[in-house]
Each structure stands twice: as C-alpha cells, then as structure tokens.
Curated annotation (Swiss-Prot):
Removed propeptide positions: 23-52
Tissue distribution of the protein: Expressed by the venom duct.
Subcellular location field: Secreted
Domain notes: The presence of a 'disulfide through disulfide knot' structurally defines this protein as a knottin.
Function: Omega-conotoxins act at presynaptic membranes, they bind and block voltage-gated calcium channels (Cav).
Source species of the chain: Conus textile (Cloth-of-gold cone)
Gene name of the encoded protein: TXO3
Keyword Transmembrane recorded: no
Keywords: Calcium channel impairing toxin, Cleavage on pair of basic residues, Disulfide bond, Ion channel impairing toxin, Knottin, Neurotoxin, Presynaptic neurotoxin, Secreted, Signal, Toxin, Voltage-gated calcium channel impairing toxin
Protein name: Omega-conotoxin-like TxO3
C-alpha cells in the first residue's frame, strides 16, 4: 500500500514537473512552428510532405528511401 502511494505521488510530481518546465518554451515552439509552415508555403519543395518513399517490397539503396525506414535490398 505504501509503495503504491509512493509511486502515485512520484508520477504526479513528474507530470507536474513536466508541465512546469514546458511552459516557457510553449510560445516559442508555436512561433517556430508558424515560421516553418510559412517557409514551406513559400518553398513547397522544402516541405516534409513532399518527400517520396518506397512501399514494402520495392528495391532500395538505403533505409532513408523506404517509408518504414528499413531496407535490406528491399523495403520492409
């Protein structure tokens, strides 16, 4: 019973600590996200959504080309 209470208190503390330390960066993160989206609108070739990848069963040279990221001569 005591161990359960200690675990619950520890989880609550760590959750609260995560929120407390994340607050100063949240506005900055939204600003960076907006700037990135604006840059992608001006330069569509830089968008992550335009990157092509191969489906499973397609021959490949590296894992970067595969949608799954796994390549051993064939995408998995």
């Amino acid at each position: 019973m005591k161990l359960t209470c200690v675990v619950i208190v520890a989880v609550l503390f760590l959750t609260a600590w995560t929120f407390v330390t994340a607050v100063p960066h949240s506005s900055n993160a939204l600003e960076n996200l907006y700037l990135k989206a604006h840059h992608e609108m001006n330069n569509p070739e830089a968008s992550e959504l335009n990157k092509r990848c191969y489906d499973g069963g397609t021959s490949c040279d590296s894992g970067i080309q595969c949608c799954s990221g796994w390549c051993i001569f064939v995408c998995f």
